[in-house]
Amino acid sequence: MIIFQPGDLSEYTDLIAEESVSIRAVRRVYGELSGETIENLMPKDIYDIAEGTRTGNREAALKSFDELGEIAGAAIVSALHIVDGMVVIGGGVSGAAKYILPGMMREMRRSISTFSGRDFDCLQMEVCNLMEADDHKRFLENTSTWVQVPFTKREILYNHTKRIGVAISTLGASKAIALGAYAFALQQIDRKYKG
């Protein structure tokens, strides 16, 4: 299924996603929209402009983060068609999550359609922003029901609701890598001595 058509999100459809989902992308888009020179601007500066604590074009700053979220959302949607798992956003630009997540969630929740006009969600699963209380509660909601296993008298608990959670990492890259390496090492030790 093709869900990212040329021209849908960006005029740069022949470039890798990182050209629109990176520090340099935030700077480039801000410069294009504001008409200002960006040589001395870092994403933190553009974030401060979005916050209103630094002079500059606030609308351009907000749009630069929103576009990053939108393109990141499109890339994540493509990945979620083949990988079933949580979406955790980290790295330097995650500090601007409140400006990035709306575009990302909008893109991940968008509809696509057929030539006959039939609309459906671009993802099979419901997308929950775990940084928002209502979405977090909905993500954790138990909608399981008992179903009978065919050709047996057994019943099992089955959750028919497909959900995916989107969260922002608060660990930082170094700590996340260290914890992952530690968990992997423990797993390998368990395999060696229990297997």
Residue positions per predicted region:
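ATP-binding/phosphotransfer module of carbohydrate and carboxylate kinases, centering on a glycine-rich
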Residues: 5-195
